[in-house]
Amino acid sequence: MKFPGPLENQRLSFLLEKAITREAQMWKVNVRKMPSNQNVSPSQRDEVIQWLAKLKYQFNLYPETFALASSLLDRFLATVKAHPKYLSCIAISCFFLAAKTVEEDERIPVLKVLARDSFCGCSSSEILRMERIILDKLNWDLHTATPLDFLHIFHAIAVSTRPQLLFSLPKLSPSQHLAVLTKQLLHCMACNQLLQFRGSMLALAMVSLEMEKLIPDWLSLTIELLQKAQMDSSQLIHCRELVAHHLSTLQSSLPLNSVYVYRPLKHTLVTCDKGVFRLHPSSVPGPDFSKDNSKPEVPVRGTAAFYHHLPAASGCKQTSTKRKVEEMEVDDFYDGIKRLYNEDNVSENVGSVCGTDLSRQEGHASPCPPLQPVSVM
């Protein structure tokens, strides 16, 4: 891989300075409002941001589109006092504005299709009217620096100044690693507790947390980025704590991989007059045999089974009082079925011991030939 040279580093520094200047002009301190019927609550804001994230995947749009849509929505909600019943219309209008700003012409969704498939409850004309209101309130200025823009810049600076970072990612390329961080950032943008920080602070906190896992000199890299961005270190520490807590709760909320342990059920074999064994299943339902083949169908969830000593069938005559009811494992019974249908050609005796002493102890002949001494020619 060709690492960026001094000119590329200067270009990254210029982009960072330009983005910070742009953010300082647009960003407003988020003032938490009391939940009421006249104001959009923080939970309602998070729900509509998560809805926009689903629309981003539904219409296969860029992450930059979602980042710009959420930034436009937050800027608009910080400027005006919006009623909650108009929140979906405001959000879909910001989403459509972001798509027209970021996406190529052929990737921009048709307005009628967007209004229909998003189930926003708004018509195309209502979305267009809300678009005009949003543009007027934002002074027709949609080119704002999003947290995703800062994430791209910080990640590029980290890769260019710390080449050893690439060796810490043996299975991921820099672009794939950036995609993983992008997904985490999109989740953090749906958290209203992180609105108190600027987008640059949020992106730097995520990069700092990730560098802490990968390289030993992550602290020096964080200080360098902090000085270039001209941020407060105390705010960065507080933002790191909130981001780490949010990502930890996000990972703990994911469904775990279920592991099922199969425990075979016990069956009782009753001997009849003619030497025929009749199988009496236990009261707990066990595995069946499919109609297509003779192999058992393993149940999805195994259940603990116990030995059930069932009485002999009425048609069977008990010839001896000393005769005991023989019990067989289900696996042994399956082996007998396989032999009956000539399915024992599979090598299942790999782990068997071929010694004669062991076969004598077990009371049966070993399928392997006896060991012979090696004769020296």
UniProtKB/Swiss-Prot annotation:
Lineage: superkingdom: Eukaryota
Family per similarity comment: Belongs to the cyclin family.
Annotated region described as Disordered, given as residue ranges: 357-377
InterPro entries, per database record: Cyclin, Cyclin-like_dom, Cyclin-like_sf, Cyclin_N
Keywords: Cyclin, Membrane, Nucleus
GO cellular component, one term: cytoplasm
Keyword check for Membrane: yes
Native source organism of the sequence: Homo sapiens (Human)
Main location: nucleus
GO MF term list: cyclin-dependent protein serine/threonine kinase regulator activity
Expression (tissue specificity): Highest levels in adult heart, brain and skeletal muscle. Lower levels in adult placenta, lung, kidney and pancreas. Also high levels in fetal brain and lower levels in fetal lung, liver and kidney. Also abundant in testis and thyroid.
Gene field: CCNI
Ranges of Pro residues composition bias in the record: 367-377
Subcellular location: Nucleus membrane
Record carries keyword Nucleus: yes
Gene3D superfamilies assigned: Cyclin-like
Protein name, entry field: Cyclin-I
One BP annotation, GO: spermatogenesis
